[in-house]
Amino acid sequence: AACTGRTSQSGTEEKPVITVTLEPQRYFTEAIAGDKYTVVSMVPKGSSPETYDPVPQQLVSLGDSKAYFRIGYIGFEQAWMDRLMNNAPHIQVFDTSKGIDLILNDNEHGNGYHDHEGHNHPGHSHAVEPHIWNSTANALILAGNTYKALCTLDKANELYYRNRYDSLYQRIQQTDSLIRQQLSLSLIHISEPTRR
């Protein structure tokens, strides 16, 4: 079960913690995990996931996490993932980007990392477009991987997670339909000749 067995100072049961890299992941994880977990993002809202360095308190707090959901190909993870896991080796790590078709980013001066003779450095990218959550197709994969990870962590609540995943899936599908509808209306409007 998701229970930690710990109680807070107020005497209530503390929820186990899942740490994610980014706020978009936090949205997916909270949408599916519901009230079973507390979800913490390593890169705070408004901070750059390419250049953010965690503060010491975050490294200490990471030790309280049951799992870490990584997104892959973000500068923060490339720079910090090994150190984070060395700091908290008991944490189960799940790659929520598994199965996503990545887009190569040939931006000469992108925000990513580029490997030159075996080393990475920021600010120069011929690598992967890291903003994988911006596609509804990818959002469905991220949500599916998050659902599977939660079921692995807490099999007893699989039906609860399934119901919440199904609800999120429908919201993403509705968003996709709305985007497609708006784009098709834009295309019709653009392609119609102006009449005088």
Language model features by range: what are they?
Residues C3-L187, S191, R195:
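Extracytoplasmic metal-acquisition and chelation regions
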